[in-house]
Amino acid sequence: MQARRKTRLYIVLAVLAGLGLTVSLTLYALSSNIDLFYTPGEIIYGKTETRALPHTGQRLRVGGYVQPGSLQRDPQTLDVRFKLYDARGVVDVSYKGILPDLFREGQGVVAQGVLDGERHITAQQVLAKHDENYTPPEVKNAMTPEKTGAQP
């Protein structure tokens, strides 16, 4: 009887250890694919709820409006630099590639990339809004002073 209990205990412990290892490896694999959404103000001052700041090297998506007069193109390459802003702040974005047709100053965009410095994002992808009347909800909420805590 005791030998049977010991065998069952070892089997249960082995199954639990295997399950724990599987969950750990799955969470580790998924964490490298998560891109959190930030606004320029949240990159500078932290998330409104938690005050958590993104760290250098973190993959993220940043949404805001292209600041008028900030677009700089290198005529020899596909390098582009511009600034994104919201009601609370401004961040620099650099991108190498062809921009979407709807990309222009004053329009809402989402840049997906890596935070290289305190206020600089190196984007791998830039998405422009697709319609004159559409603004992504995250960007719309970031631009309203009552949502951001900014004073009018």
UniProtKB/Swiss-Prot annotation:
<keyword id="KW-0997">Cell inner membrane</keyword>
<keyword id="KW-0735">Signal-anchor</keyword>
<keyword id="KW-0349">Heme</keyword>
<dbReference type="InterPro" id="IPR004329">
    <property type="entry name" value="CcmE"/>
</dbReference>
<comment type="similarity">
    <text>Belongs to the CcmE/CycJ family.</text>
</comment>
<feature type="binding site" description="axial binding residue">
    <location>
        <position position="134"/>
    </location>
    <ligand>
        <name>heme</name>
    </ligand>
</feature>
<dbReference type="InterPro" id="IPR012340">
    <property type="entry name" value="NA-bd_OB-fold"/>
</dbReference>
<keyword id="KW-0812">Transmembrane</keyword>
<dbReference type="GO" id="GO:0046872">
    <property type="term" value="F:metal ion binding"/>
</dbReference>
<keyword id="KW-1003">Cell membrane</keyword>
<dbReference type="GO" id="GO:0017004">
    <property type="term" value="P:cytochrome complex assembly"/>
</dbReference>
<dbReference type="Pfam" id="PF03100">
    <property type="entry name" value="CcmE"/>
</dbReference>
<keyword id="KW-0479">Metal-binding</keyword>
<keyword id="KW-0472">Membrane</keyword>
<dbReference type="GO" id="GO:0020037">
    <property type="term" value="F:heme binding"/>
</dbReference>
<keyword id="KW-0201">Cytochrome c-type biogenesis</keyword>
<feature type="topological domain" description="Cytoplasmic">
    <location>
        <begin position="1"/>
        <end position="8"/>
    </location>
</feature>
<feature type="topological domain" description="Periplasmic">
    <location>
        <begin position="30"/>
        <end position="152"/>
    </location>
</feature>
<feature type="region of interest" description="Disordered">
    <location>
        <begin position="133"/>
        <end position="152"/>
    </location>
</feature>
<feature type="transmembrane region" description="Helical; Signal-anchor for type II membrane protein">
    <location>
        <begin position="9"/>
        <end position="29"/>
    </location>
</feature>
<dbReference type="InterPro" id="IPR036127">
    <property type="entry name" value="CcmE-like_sf"/>
</dbReference>
<keyword id="KW-1133">Transmembrane helix</keyword>
<protein>
    <recommendedName>
        <fullName>Cytochrome c-type biogenesis protein CcmE</fullName>
    </recommendedName>
</protein>
<dbReference type="GO" id="GO:0005886">
    <property type="term" value="C:plasma membrane"/>
</dbReference>
<feature type="binding site" description="covalent">
    <location>
        <position position="130"/>
    </location>
    <ligand>
        <name>heme</name>
    </ligand>
</feature>
<keyword id="KW-0408">Iron</keyword>
<comment type="function">
    <text>Heme chaperone required for the biogenesis of c-type cytochromes. Transiently binds heme delivered by CcmC and transfers the heme to apo-cytochromes in a process facilitated by CcmF and CcmH.</text>
</comment>
